[in-house]
């Protein structure tokens, strides 16, 4: 596979395969931040009932809201689970905070995590805390990042930087001009993902959180 990031039909919510063949960059070193993680800010994400807790270390890759049809469909279906808290924002967007996979860990309640996929063979999985059906994160399994649901951070969540895939937003939604609104994905979005991958030494750590595969 050559060239830039590839988007498949099921991956329109910004979860890309980033082929190393297309990045001819020499002298890449492992990210040094892991040595001094105590110097970085920790943010905690929790399920609604408090049984599941995640910690994210350091600054996120980016924070944005996605309006793709896949995120909207998954959000609607996850919200239909018993007593589930909201996933979608009122304007049909899904607010996400993207972190490197090696900077997010579940520190409490891992046994409650359960993954859901729109299709059995989808590379994108959404992991909920089944204790209260709170959506915790989205994992594009071929990527190097996790997309944490922003509404699961009770405090300290960084503000949104952009809106993406706005061409697929719900009919009738008028977006404010307080943020950059991109009909697809922006160059800034892509560059930040690639920069994070370079800093990771082109590694793609696997997230094993959530065991059972379900179709939502």
In which residue ranges do the predicted regions lie?
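Small, basic N-terminal interaction modules of short regulatory proteins
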Residues: 24
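Intrinsic low-complexity, disordered N-terminal segments enriched in polar/charged/small residues
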Residues: 7-9
């Amino acid at each position: 596979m050559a060239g830039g990031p590839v988007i498949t039909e099921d991956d329109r919510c910004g979860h890309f395969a980033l082929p190393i063949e297309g990045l001819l960059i020499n002298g890449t070193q492992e990210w040094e931040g892991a040595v001094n993680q105590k110097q970085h800010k920790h943010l905690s994400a929790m399920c609604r009932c408090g049984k599941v807790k995640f910690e994210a270390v350091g600054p996120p890759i980016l924070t944005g809201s996605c309006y793709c049809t896949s995120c909207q469909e998954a959000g609607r279906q996850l919200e239909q689970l018993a007593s589930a808290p909201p996933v979608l924002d009122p304007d049909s967007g899904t607010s996400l905070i993207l972190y490197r996979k090696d900077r997010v860990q579940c520190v409490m309640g891992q046994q409650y995590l359960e993954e859901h996929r729109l299709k059995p063979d989808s590379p994108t999985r959404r992991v909920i805390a089944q204790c209260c059906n709170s959506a915790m994160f989205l994992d594009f399994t071929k990527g190097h990042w996790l997309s944490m649901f922003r509404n699961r951070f009770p405090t300290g969540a960084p503000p949104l930087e952009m809106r993406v895939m706005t061409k697929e937003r719900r009919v009738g939604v008028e977006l404010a001009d307080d943020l950059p609104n991109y009909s697809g994905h922006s160059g800034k979005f892509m560059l930040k993902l690639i920069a994070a991958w370079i800093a990771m030494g082109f590694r793609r750590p696997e997230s094993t959180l959530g065991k059972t595969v379900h179709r939502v």
